[in-house]
């Protein structure tokens, strides 16, 4: 009886651990915005003790010579804080991802180890001033690290 009780306790402990892990907030969130720019993302950075990593990704569908020859994509990125302060920067995203005959996909690290100066929801807006024909949109992946 004693041995059965310890197995039962162990099983209950495993179930409790699995439930606790499954109830946590996700550590990574991805979103793709298609259509016309600007591509706007809302990012919850309510935990100022955590750091956040950001990746950008995109897909371009066009003629083979355009897809093949595109080396980088010029992006104008604006960050707006919860208190409505805006920071702007120009970024050149390398287009070194997967290439097929009429399509090119790219994913690149954007910022690593970001610790927000303010807790809350930040807005990231992306414009593509020299967008190639066939740009399908922009994606943002946010990873939270403790």
Q: Where are each of the predicted segments found?
A:
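Bacterial signal peptide processing site
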Residues: 24-26
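Edge beta-strands of jelly-roll/beta-sandwich modules across compartments, strongly enriched
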Residues: 132-142
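Noncatalytic modules at the cell exterior or secretory-pathway interfaces
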Residues: 49-56, 114-129
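Short amphipathic, basic-aromatic surface patches that mediate peripheral association
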Residues: 57-67
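An anionic, turn-rich surface loop/hairpin at beta-sheet edges
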Residues: 89-116
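Short coil-to-beta strand junction motifs in C2/discoidin
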Residues: 67-75
């Amino acid at each position: 009886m004693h041995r059965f009780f310890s197995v039962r306790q162990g099983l209950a402990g495993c179930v409790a651990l699995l439930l606790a892990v499954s109830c946590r907030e996700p550590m990574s969130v991805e979103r793709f915005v298609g259509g016309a720019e600007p591509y706007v993302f809302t990012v919850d950075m309510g935990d100022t003790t955590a750091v956040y990593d950001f990746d950008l990704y995109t897909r371009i569908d066009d003629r083979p010579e355009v897809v093949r020859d595109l080396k980088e994509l010029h992006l104008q990125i604006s960050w707006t804080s919860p208190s409505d302060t805006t920071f702007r920067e120009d970024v050149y995203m390398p287009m070194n991802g997967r290439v097929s005959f009429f399509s090119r996909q790219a994913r690149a690290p954007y910022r690593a180890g970001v610790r927000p100066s303010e807790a809350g929801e930040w807005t990231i807006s992306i414009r593509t001033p020299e967008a190639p024909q066939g740009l399908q949109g922009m994606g943002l992946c946010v990873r939270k690290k403790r």
